[in-house]
Amino acid sequence: MPFFKMIENVSRHFSKSKKIRVALLIDEFFGGAGTAYGGYGFLARKFIAKYIPDEDIEIDVLLGKREKKGGLPSIFALKEHCDNVDLHWLPRRKFFSSLWLAAKHYDLYLSIELTDDYVLKCEKNDKKKLILWRQDPRPKRVWKTIIGTMKSIKDPCFYRQEIYQLVHDMNEEKRIKFITQGNSLNPLALELYNLENTVPISYVPNPIEIDFEYRFNLNQKNTIIFLGRLEAQKRCWIFCEIARQMPQYNFIVLGNFFRHIDDNKKMMREYLPPNNPKNLIFKGHVDGEEKKELLKSARILINTSIWEGIPISWLECLSYGTVIISAFERDDLVSRFGEYVGEVPGDGFDSVNRFKIAIDEYMNNDELYVLKATQAIEYTRSNHSIKKFKETMKHVIHSVAKD
């Protein structure tokens, strides 16, 4: 330990930068450097790495332990540059990762969830703190009694008790600042990490790019969309079956297969081109202006997932007056700005009629739809702007760095 502390102190002494050095722990960067496209990576790349660095804060992205490839010896880290941010994969050998971290002398860690413990286990400074941003805590009972009810196909269970125990231990050592994107997630986090109810958890809502110039136009809102990766827990096949049974409406799938592609395509085979119903279109992954235009024309977002936190896709859609019809609820967002059809366990095909009733209501009742759509737009502008996110997250970073 004294050796690594000496390395850190020497490195800090000769550092030209006096900024707060933040290491962002994540396992994806929304396609950057060949990583996966997902909600955590989206937050990391599009918001934290883009808007938090300033004259007082600098951020590196740590993507865990590097893989065995490229011919690079296992004692070296791997570095790439993306969007003006350095992305690092640590050496495969723990001693050299600990040495590398000491030389980098980060002031604190920031993690969107915590999907891997390699970096924190290699950190030899037992005073260094972690800001843990809760997005989607999943206790073991959730895997067993909810996600585990799926029969035809399942995503692998990524429950890892050793990570949750590490978080518990760091909390006992007063080395963690918990923040959450939704207050309804707090009981789940307390259960997952075996924490006391008195543990403080600060509210830091997820940000989205909000078009404040957008003006709601009822005449544009005529499509029904699915927005997300085509993976088992998302259960896109329910959306597709709804489309097949409701040919009077236009349905659009926005998202790609990424993990376990063959299994997921097999589950979806009767709905994919060329077998897809005429009113069901697959757009693949979309971003930028194309995505904005599709959201502007969407009247309803259908969420068929068996489990989620609070998806970024919800907030993006709400900002354009697209209401949500969902099989799960978080922070009362669905009830306020759409309709909760009730819990849907298993593969979910028996829920199609519940979705159909709600869809008909919002496609045909303009008065109800406009009321909830306009309220949704106002809500997102008041609570999920980049300006508010920057102020809140920077305050958290400064307070933890000074503590």
Which residues does each PLM region occupy?
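Membrane-proximal helix-turn-helix segments that form the acceptor-binding/catalytic region
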Residues: 138, 149-179
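Aromatic "clamp/platform" in nucleotide-sugar-dependent glycosyltransferases that forms part
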Residues: 306
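Short hydrophobic beta-strand element within catalytic cores of glycosyltransferases
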Residues: 323-333
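A charged, aromatic-enriched C-terminal amphipathic alpha-helix characteristic of glycosyltransferases
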Residues: 363-398
